[in-house]
Amino acid sequence: MGCVQCKDKEATKLTDERDGSLTQSSGYRYGTDPTPQHYPSFGVTSIPNYNNFHATGGQGLTVFGGVNSSSHTGTLRTRGGTGVTLFEALYDYEARTEDDLSFHKGEKFQILNSSEGDWWEARSLTTGETGYIPSNYVAPVDSIQAEEWYFGKLGRKDAERQLLSFGNPRGTFLIRESETTKGAYSLSIRDWDDMKGDHVKHYKIRKLDNGGYYITTRAQFETLQQLVQHYSEKADGLCFNLTVIATNNTPQTVGLAKDAWEVARDSLFLEQKLGQGCFAEVWRGTWNGNTKVAIKTLKPGTMSPESFLEEAQIMKKLKHDKLVQLYAVVSRRPIYIVTEYMSKGSLLIFLKDGEGRALKLPNLVDMAAQVAAGMAYIERMNYIHRDLRSANILVGNGLICKIADFGLARLIEDNEYTARQGAKFPIKWTAPEAALYGRFTIKSDVWSFGILLTELVTKGRVPYPGMNNREVLEQVERGYRMPCPQDCPISLHELMIHCWKKDPEERPTFEYLQGFLEDYFTATEPQYQPGDNL
């Protein structure tokens, strides 16, 4: 947030099983978004539906206003026949408050109270101590979820990103839930050949009626563990034998700690200023002296604390691995917004001055696909971003992109900004119906996404070069659209044009955009060869 000015065949012929089918008509894949394994469920009804595409003029003139739960299942071990389920730590965790419990990977727990959702009261069987633990850091002992190779609700594209990370050898693998077949799993393996180079193959793991598992019916196993052991010893028709388990990065906790939503200002330490805009400064900092966070400090008068707190209650329920997580707030002026820290900063700066300058088209399209995945989630939740552009996308290690500042723009009370004119308002990213009449919907976000695509392929160039805001508004109303950027494939520019349709309802959905971009180099540009720039 901020102003523009400032900122399966059998035997040896097994084939890889794609989780998403390619549609006959378009060649694009429509799959569910990857979502974190243990995020809690929040009903759509708790989030207002801002997407009234047929808003009247009066409604439109209001300015900038106006999860899948994955329960712990599997084979459970009880303690001494008492019916007490034991859980096992999947990661190390260092206590952040006096009520938290520090623990190490592999440590066993008795869960005393799991009714709190994201933070459970537990007793360590190692130390005997009790305290709160993050529920997404543990799994039932001996369950599939406790296996290092099990990645839960990881999407196909995210599995490929994980496996193709630098340093992973051929045969690196993981198992995840199937996106298309309920109760089935997918085995994803890193492979290599002369034609494709490094790539990933996916195999569907099906369940037998008697509870067993198989990839091919001639090789059946009682457990997934036995299946993994078998294919680790020999490929037996797979592209390669299983060699190394993919690295499963430690996830973000859901919130900073139990009941740590409104935090004291003195619990936050501002360490390094990362950037500033017309309405806020962004700092890297720590909470409670032990947890790295990003802190947005809003300038006085930017928005009312009451309006912000009301919107923040909605924002904190939006949880997806392509959205920057809102951790906590300081609700008294000056308002502080505490979020997860992303090491590479904003996508805009990353593209202009950072590692992004050297990226080729496959990386850039993948980053766009990640943004589309996050926006597809926002779309499903009937929410709107209102200020989608590269400055509001944050980049982490491994070129992971997450959407920030969703929903905040409508709360800004600055007169120049709310009048949708002047240097503070992002005219060049805003759909004409939103800029002229205040009709902000998910379809105006789609328009903005088309502009963001130009930022990606031009490495952060300001849209509509050589034109001021007034000229942009006038020319766009007359039908002008930006030409195809240098070295950008025609097919990608056609997608931008599709996002910039005058009629909002003719613009694509983010679900469509995600599928198109995720399969871009197989369905649309299979003959792509890298050039000097892209």
Swiss-Prot record:
The keyword Membrane appears for this protein: yes
Modification sites for Phosphothreonine: T12
GO biological process, one term: regulation of cell shape
Residue numbers bearing the Phosphotyrosine modification: Y417, Y528
CDD domains: PTKc_Fyn (cd05070), SH2_Src_Fyn (cd10368), SH3_Fyn_Yrk (cd12006)
Domain (Protein kinase) ranges: 268-521
Tissue distribution of the protein: Thymus and spleen.
Lipidation (S-palmitoyl cysteine): C3, C6
Molecular-function annotations in GO: ATP binding; metal ion binding; non-membrane spanning protein tyrosine kinase activity; protein kinase activity; protein tyrosine kinase activity; signaling receptor binding; tubulin binding
Reactions listed under catalytic activity: L-tyrosyl-[protein] + ATP = O-phospho-L-tyrosyl-[protein] + ADP + H(+)
Keywords: ATP-binding, Cell membrane, Cytoplasm, Developmental protein, Kinase, Lipoprotein, Manganese, Membrane, Metal-binding, Myristate, Nucleotide-binding, Nucleus, Palmitate, Phosphoprotein, Proto-oncogene, SH2 domain, SH3 domain, Transferase, Tyrosine-protein kinase
SUPFAM superfamilies: Protein kinase-like (PK-like), SH2 domain, SH3-domain
UniProt keyword Lipid biosynthesis, yes or no: no
Activity: how regulated: Inhibited by phosphorylation of Tyr-528 by leukocyte common antigen and activated by dephosphorylation of this site.
Family listed: Belongs to the protein kinase superfamily. Tyr protein kinase family. SRC subfamily.
Subunit relationships: Associates through its SH3 domain, to the p85 subunit of phosphatidylinositol 3-kinase.
Annotated protein name in UniProt: Tyrosine-protein kinase Fyn
Organism: Gallus gallus (Chicken)
